[in-house]
Amino acid sequence: MMKLSTMATGLASEDVINSLIKNWAHDEETIRLWRASSNFVIAYSKDEEHYFLRFSFEQEKSIEHIQAELEYMSYLNANHYPCVTPVVSLNGNYIEATQSPEGMYYAVVFKAAQGKSLDENLTELQFEDWGKALGALHRLSEAYEPVSKKRGDWQDVLNGMASILQRHHEKEAIVELEHLIKELQAIPVLKSNYGLIHYDFQLDNLFYEDDTRI
């Protein structure tokens, strides 16, 4: 989840949205806000095809992080896992950027996934397929070796927390964090117990096709 201050700024700035979406062909009258959570997401259409513009503030998600995401998604598609695909911009890029008074924003566009959204009233078969899809994703993640872009890990997150605590002189919290880091570092890191997972594999992020059951 992004900072509330970042969310408020991003939602209030049409200039940022206009500056980013102009890099992809679109029908102006179809643009609408889809959501603002860990990213800003704008839904739009072009010639009756549906797309999503996803953008984020540089302090929330670096360009290196986004490049690593796209590399992983390319790996999933190459291994026949159903995953949305990024759309090349009019400039020939997968990632576009725009500078604003508060900093840089990075954007990617994805073609809308096939299938339908599911509500919480799943059938037994759909529950089974949901679990199979997550299991297949984690099996692929277990074998995944980044080619060029390695995503940040838990140590990067905790190091970021440490820098914030030190800045605010939270001595007791710093001691507790140091204990936590030592405990986590003592856990053996194996392919069977450590790797990339999907932390938000919920219905909002899934589309289901009845005929293929994926």
Question: Where are these predicted regions, by residue range?
Answer:
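A cross-family kinase active-site recognition segment
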Residues: 120-171, 192-194
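Active-site acidic catalytic loop and adjacent metal/ATP-binding pocket
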Residues: 37-48, 52, 182-214
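ATP-binding pocket architecture of kinase catalytic cores
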Residues: 46-145
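Contiguous, function-dense segments enriched for cysteine-driven chemistry
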Residues: 158-178, 203-211
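Conserved NTP-binding catalytic cores of kinases and kinase-like/nucleotidyltransferase enzymes
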Residues: 1-90, 209-212
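Short Pro/Gly-enriched beta-strand edge/turn motifs at strand-loop
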Residues: 20-28, 178-189
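Short, P/G- and charge-enriched loop/turn segments at secondary-structure junctions
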Residues: 29-30, 95-99, 184-193
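Generic alpha-helical secondary structure signal
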Residues: 105-108, 156, 179
